UniProtKB/Swiss-Prot annotation:
Compartments (UniProt record): Cellular thylakoid membrane
Family, similarity comment: Belongs to the reaction center PufL/M/PsbA/D family.
Protein name stated in the entry: Photosystem II protein D1 1
GO cellular component: photosystem II; plasma membrane-derived thylakoid membrane
Amino acid sequence: MSTAIRSGRQSNWGSFCDWVTNTNNRIYVGWFGVLMIPCLLAATICFIIAFVAAPPVDIDGIREPVAGSLIYGNNIISGAVVPSSNAIGLHFYPIWEAASLDEWLYNGGPFQLVVFHFLIGISAYMGRQWELSYRLGMRPWICVAYSAPLSAAFAVFLVYPFGQGSFSDAMPLGISGTFNYMLVFQAEHNILMHPFHMLGVAGVFGGSLFSAMHGSLVTSSLVRETTESESQNYGYKFGQEEETYNIVAAHGYFGRLIFQYASFNNSRSLHFFLGAWPVIGIWFTSMGISTMAFNLNGFNFNQSILDGQGRVVSTWADVLNRAGLGMEVMHERNAHNFPLDLAAAESTPVALQAPAIG
């Protein structure tokens, strides 16, 4: 009896699936990578072209275009991809929705193309982190940590425009555009007096401090494996089982420098703390941006202290308020959009008596 054996050739689709999910590839692709790669490529290519050559954009919707590209006179610092026009509002504005390419460019269509593809791409990047961790049998905390900057991007590019009613209020894609966004945000929402922003500052600056402290402590307590004439980095071999630094010495040093319980004696809890502190801080900042997007602003302590005769005793809150009003006036280039808090409030005299002339 003879048996016919068919050669089991794998289909092209099967080969593609194996390649996508193969953890031995030099760079892991993954199913999230199939979505991530084209989205980030589209966002990057459009950003570069728009940053270099996009025509001016009517960001305020009042026929006063703002130039952001390099060939229109900007440099690397002042250049930006200008947000889509206030005339577009929150409408989805792909190329096919415009009457012509010139109209699409004039109304800031490239900004939406870049931002939407970018947000999808970085979300897929987080999914790819989870996917690779899952396939390697690792715990999922890498993608959880990455969710902090991801949430910040969604807050400034999506949630804030939704709350304000127009993508023209989103953060411009450029260096000075980012600073302008921050100044206007302070002027309109008093973010410096918002508790969630304070927690975010503590997270970022505290994370930097803890990172520097940890790195310096470890580097200062390395187990000597080299001579004075060799680099200390040669004392570590990738994959070695022995500890490369003396955690007991580091713990003893820091415990005596501050006090005993300020120093971790468990390497795992230490590194969890180093990861959790800045992540939680940035989460709070993202939540703060998202709440202020709907005008739930920072605390207002303006003119909250009065003397016995009812006169205002100025505090730092009043200094912030005056600075914010000044920034808001400079930001609003058109008179019909004059800041409501200036138009409705009583005028504050800047001088008690006019100087005599002549």
